[in-house]
């Protein structure tokens, strides 16, 4: 039995300076991290007779030890608090379940700059525009820019080794700076400047310069050039007319909040240079009994102050909640950014409309999320009843994909009580079996997955085997032979076979390979969750197989050529910009690749042609 925490003795040792505290349970796990302007005063509040909430009561009941870190300032304490939350993921803290850095558009500092998507640290020389809410928004913008301003987007390894322009040049989406004489340095630099102005929100300057160039071209009787610039002007105008634009200098993050049934949604609207770049909804993990104020305060702190997130701080943050520590947050963000950051909770005019939009989006996203969660919960409850299990907290499903026995890939997808856990999806490359032997493939993937130590929380309640009796027999055989420290009898093995016509709703389920199967009604919620996880597993397996097949397809031709090993294959593909570029190259161009002689270049050329 663990000793009772001696709060009185502990509080006598605590200072009244600012700092951070970490609370531990009997197992030595950090269960809560907090900050305080006055550590003694804040920590004393936990041990009063009348606590503020049940959540605090439950927390205090588990405390076995408290560590304190004193800081110079309250700002230091705030930064340290969020780094500790990130490190320990305490169960009584509100946790932001998002660890992705945001993507930017990168304009390189090369002689002929290129456009690309970028995530992570900004080490490369060049300019960064953003952040954008996701990769899709960046790719859409890059595709749009390519149509209006024909600046290259190819990798430098491709750009440096071209002797003829690529397809992008042929269709007018690149000026072809890789080949001398196709475009002047001045013209390319001008298009790069247009991109820079456009991404900075200075559309009017772009239009003014383009109009002046069009008029000059007309005066010089260069009508084809004037027509090309006219088309560019029209394209820029079409884009700017569709934009939701505020004041040209607006550089804001707008944060709306919705809270219902113990779940919170925080919706962030990203506005840069007056343009809405996009938005994103977050669903932080909220311990029971948490107040909305704590949710918002913790989310904002974690969102901006955790160093690994690579956030770009805007000049102003609009919040849909009046924080108690608003001044402290603004000071901490300003210190982090090296410039003044304003935090507003009661904006007017356009800013108030932005905040209303973020609030509406948060409410809509929360309703959708609650509906989805309710549906998956109902389906899992129904499946647990069918399988005579008390509950299903974790379920895993396996599928095999190949083409005529080649490039075999197995997939494992994971569902928990909230649905798909995509971060835990896995693919396994299958090797050393007879091509096309699905049973051997299933045997191999199950041994690799379960023939090792597994955390208690990650032992599945149900393992679904796609393929019917034969595959289920393999699973039973594997589990019978497993020698592992965890309870291998806990997972229920369930086989699922498609119906005679392979139509959804006609599936047959098996508990035993030699037993009779059973079917569920097509409208059964239990069947729907089985179909959901099976389809996820199928798609995941096919995706992995296609990638593997494409990789083999791109290198298999070269592998048959004598004298071309892995290093030379890699060098050829790198310098020629891929297999297609190599197929189109002449003998002389191939011979310029390091490590390729004239004789070998001729052999490669004729092998690829015939």
UniProtKB/Swiss-Prot annotation:
GO molecular function terms attached to this record: DNA binding; excinuclease ABC activity
Gene3D superfamilies, A to Z: 5' to 3' exonuclease, C-terminal subdomain, GIY-YIG endonuclease, UVR domain, UvrC, RNAse H endonuclease domain
Entry keyword set: Cytoplasm, DNA damage, DNA excision, DNA repair, Excision nuclease, SOS response
Listed name of the protein: UvrABC system protein C
Keyword DNA repair in annotation: yes
NCBIfam families (UniProt xref): PRK00558.1-5, uvrC
Occurrences of domain GIY-YIG (ranges): 16-94
InterPro entries in the record: GIY-YIG_endonuc, GIY-YIG_endonuc_sf, GIY-YIG_UvrC_Cho, Hlx-hairpin-Hlx_DNA-bd_motif, RuvA_2-like, UVR_dom, UVR_dom_sf, UvrABC_protein_C
One annotated GO biological process: SOS response
Family the entry assigns: Belongs to the UvrC family.
Top-level division of the source organism's lineage: Bacteria
Known function: The UvrABC repair system catalyzes the recognition and processing of DNA lesions. UvrC both incises the 5' and 3' sides of the lesion. The N-terminal half is responsible for the 3' incision and the C-terminal half is responsible for the 5' incision.
All copies of domain UVR, residue ranges: 204-239
Assembly and interaction partners: Interacts with UvrB in an incision complex.
Location within or outside the cell: Cytoplasm
Pfam families per record: GIY-YIG (PF01541), HHH_5 (PF14520), UVR (PF02151), UvrC_RNaseH (PF22920), UvrC_RNaseH_dom (PF08459)
GO cellular component: cytoplasm; excinuclease repair complex
